[in-house]
Amino acid sequence: PFDRISNSAFSDF
């Protein structure tokens, strides 16, 4: 949703 490339750990929020 947000930055699945940069924050692949916090991208599914």
Curated annotation (Swiss-Prot):
Major location category of this protein: secreted
Upper classification of the organism: Eukaryota, Metazoa, Spiralia, Lophotrochozoa, Mollusca
Protein name: Lymna-DF-amide 4
Organism field: Lymnaea stagnalis (Great pond snail)
Assigned keywords, A-Z: Amidation, Neuropeptide, Secreted
Superkingdom of the source species: Eukaryota
Gene Ontology CC annotations of this record: extracellular region
GO annotation (BP), single: neuropeptide signaling pathway
Compartments, record wording: Secreted
Sites of Phenylalanine amide modification: 13
